[in-house]
């Protein structure tokens, strides 16, 4: 009898116990967490994505990811030179109501101008200019302009394998040592000191899922980079490019990481999975791989990891270039592991960042209660309540990390964690050996509606965009016009009524004119 009770109780407990299947990571944040404006040039993508289910990592197929041991702390100090023009425009119509406009616009900077400005900056003799004084004249539009070069400190990363500089502001994400152009015509970057690349160290090839290794063989320049792609003028810059290592082709990301993927099956017929051609390229160029028939979880997982990394780089490229980005683009910037990391949100077109403690979330109870995201591993309900309470609130509303609320329901980018499911669609829906470039957007199809916003402003690496303000002087001069009108009407009335002879009008008119002159001068000085 006791055994029957024990078995029945065990079965009931097992049936009542919920299975925790996390499909999302979400950050816990303090109520007093501070948000700061994010700098697009400093955003780095997660270096890898780990699967939540350990069974996915059973090595049925041996997978090799080859990466150089890049020291991400190697920085090179330098400056950015940004040339701008300050304009003051005075538009005075015939009725004496001037409008003063101030505008700031970028100008193409020359190498000699940049060097001179940096020399003045280092000596502390550079004088920052502002808007010139207005020059107003009746019934005309006058413009006065000053030009200035703004010098800012801007460190970049050193690639120790090519001795090149890596940063999002460079075309293709990479620049040769010394002075280099940026993706902005009005900005140049100059290094303070030429850095020396450390020597490559020898290493052995190791099989595994994610393997870091150094150079195979000796020598100080073991790794060779392809020339950076600059593209046609005005074209969106790409932040990854093919590079070679002893005739092996991989992908180089804008933060300096190089990756080559290969798969060797556990039978004599080995298969190599390798990205051999990824943009920079014209539209329609394909991604070529050598995989033909073999579909397995490890290949799928690795494929999607690569795709997500490229999507993250594409998102950074959009933001740096001021191109439209969707709310779900932010989801490609965040990590998918537990632990502390950066949290992003957008408000009125400005990207902000803070720090949160990421935890696994099971979204099976998503929207069961208002603002509920799901439950964590402890069985606690997780909510996101930072939504607008205004009656005129927009629909949809943006949350953090690519979340948004639409028609009262929270929508989350579950494709970020359900990579195996997305990979199945990716692998079977399109032939792997020739994957067209638009396939990079397939994963975001799981995120339902996307909201596109033009994003330019404080986050941009462009230090100064277009700014205009107008000051109207009509109301300041209104009292002067009223006084003049009153004087004229009074004089006409006195003459018509023959109260005062006309010859005395000049004696009466002089004091008021002097008074008006005084008022006008006082108004200018104020």
From Swiss-Prot:
Family annotation (Pfam families): Rhabdo_glycop_CD, Rhabdo_glycop_FD
Transmembrane segments: none
Carbohydrate attachment residues: 32, 445, 459
Subcellular location field: Virion membrane
Keywords annotated in UniProt: Glycoprotein, Host-virus interaction, Membrane, Signal, Viral attachment to host cell, Virion, Virus entry into host cell
GO annotation terms (biological process): symbiont entry into host cell; virion attachment to host cell
Keyword Signal: yes
Entry annotated with the keyword Mitochondrion: no
Record's signal peptide: 1-17
A GO cellular component annotation in the UniProt record: viral envelope
Name of the protein described by the UniProt record: Spike glycoprotein
Organism: Sigma virus
Organism lineage string: Viruses, Riboviria, Orthornavirae, Negarnaviricota, Haploviricotina
């Amino acid at each position: 009898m006791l055994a029957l009770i024990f078995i029945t109780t065990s079965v009931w407990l097992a049936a009542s116990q919920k299975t925790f299947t996390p499909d999302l990571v979400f950050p816990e944040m303090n109520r007093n967490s501070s948000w700061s404006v994010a700098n697009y040039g400093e955003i780095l993508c997660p270096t890898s994505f780990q699967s939540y289910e350990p069974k996915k990592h059973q090595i049925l197929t041996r997978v090799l990811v080859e990466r150089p041991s890049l020291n991400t702390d190697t920085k090179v100090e330098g400056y950015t030179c940004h040339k701008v023009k300050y304009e003051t425009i005075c538009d005075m119509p015939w009725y004496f109501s001037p409008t003063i406009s101030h505008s700031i616009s970028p100008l193409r900077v020359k190498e000699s101008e940049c060097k001179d400005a940096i020399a003045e900056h280092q000596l502390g003799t550079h004088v920052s200019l502002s808007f010139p004084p207005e020059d107003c004249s009746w019934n005309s539009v006058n413009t006065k302009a000053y030009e200035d070069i703004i010098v800012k400190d801007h460190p970049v990363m050193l690639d120790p394998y090519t001795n090149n500089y890596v940063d999002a502001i460079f075309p293709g994400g990479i620049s040769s040592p010394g002075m280099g152009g940026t993706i902005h015509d009005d900005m140049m970057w100059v290094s303070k000191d030429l850095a020396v690349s450390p020597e490559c160290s020898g290493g052995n090839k190791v099989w595994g899922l994610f393997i870091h290794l150094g150079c195979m063989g000796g020598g100080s320049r073991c790794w060779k980079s392809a020339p950076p792609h600059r593209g046609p003028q005005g074209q969106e810059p790409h932040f990854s490019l093919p590079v070679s290592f002893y005739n092996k082709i991989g992908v180089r990301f804008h933060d300096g990481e190089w990756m080559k993927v290969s798969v060797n099956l556990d039978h004599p017929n080995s298969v190599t999975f390798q990205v051999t051609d990824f943009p920079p390229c014209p539209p329609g160029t394909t991604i070529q791989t050598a995989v033909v028939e073999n579909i397995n979880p490890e290949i799928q997982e690795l494929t999607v990891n690569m795709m997500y990394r490229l999507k993250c780089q594409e998102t950074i490229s959009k933001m740096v270039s001021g191109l439209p980005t969707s709310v779900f683009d932010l989801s490609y910037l965040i990590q998918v592991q537990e632990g502390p990391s950066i949290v992003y949100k957008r408000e009125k077109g400005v990207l902000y960042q803070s720090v949160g403690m990421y935890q696994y979330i099971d979204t099976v109870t998503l929207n069961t209660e208002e603002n509920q995201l799901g439950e964590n591993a402890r069985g606690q309900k997780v909510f996101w309540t930072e939504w607008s309470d205004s009656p005129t609130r927009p629909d949809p509303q943006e949350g953090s990390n690519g979340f948004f609320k639409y028609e009262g329901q929270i929508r989350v980018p579950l494709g970020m964690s359900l990579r195996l499911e997305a990979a199945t669609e990716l692998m079977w829906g399109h032939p792997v050996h020739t994957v067209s470039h638009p396939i990079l957007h397939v994963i975001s199809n799981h995120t339902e509606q996307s909201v596109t916003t033009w994003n330019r402003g404080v986050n941009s690496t462009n230090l100064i965009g277009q700014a205009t303000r107008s000051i109207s002087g009509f109301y300041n001069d209104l009292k002067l016009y009223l006084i003049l009108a009153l004087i004229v009407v009074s004089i006409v009335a006195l003459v018509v009524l023959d109260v005062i002879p006309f010859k005395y009008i000049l004696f009466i008119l002089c004091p008021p004119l002097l008074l008006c002159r005084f008022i006008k001068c006082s108004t200018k000085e104020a």
